[in-house]
């Protein structure tokens, strides 16, 4: 959730708009050793989606951990270029996106996440069960309370056209609005 029929076109729109605006585009690929249940190097689950693969990008990052900043050259590459803001799109909201958002925030970058250009999957395990929509909603609400400015692709495109950053929120106000609603 949201459906890939919504998220994939939004991911592509964001990539295209960033490239047109001269904003560096970084593609991140999660790769695991052969034999892994998902993302095994050379497998279909590790391949970039053709729509992503065909788009121009400034850097391709191969990672083995959830965060795109852990064990990769991405942080140094961003610092060398004086990049102060990361716009996060792609999958999965609750795993790679959340991990990257939090690490980037902790390391001092401003972070923006496009909620309709990211997505989650449903889970069931010993801790319980949650739908993809529940997971996506909870993670984006929490990210927006402290770690990232979370907005739609349309809102980001409008802010980009105006040369503005997305508005950020904070933990206190997010909580106060919830308890007074």
Language-model features, listed with the residues they occupy:
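Charged, well-structured alpha/beta interaction segments
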Residues: 5-8, 24-26
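Von Willebrand factor
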Residues: 17-33
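Glycine-rich, proline-tolerant flexible connector loops at the mouths of alpha/beta enzymes
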Residues: 1, 34-36
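Acidic/histidine-rich helix-loop elements
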Residues: 1-5, 128
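Active-site-adjacent betaalpha module
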Residues: 9-16, 20-21, 38-181
